[in-house]
Amino acid sequence: MVKNTDDVSVSTPAKEGIMQGNGAWCVVGFPPCKDNKCYCCIGGRTHARYSTMAECRHACF
């Protein structure tokens, strides 16, 4: 049985990011960047951490 994670209440830090048409996101405040000091590429061609949004967008999209 697959559990629907939408029903789970989880406290997450505020996230900000930019999404591209391919579904990739660069976000801050998302693990492993919980301290809001780096940007993470989610759903893109990399899953690395970057120090700036510009670096993340260039690598991720």
Swiss-Prot record:
Disulfide bonds join 38-60. InterPro entries: Meg. Ubiquitous. Keywords: Disulfide bond. Belongs to the MEG family. This is Protein MATERNALLY EXPRESSED GENE 6. It comes from Zea mays (Maize). The gene is MEG6.
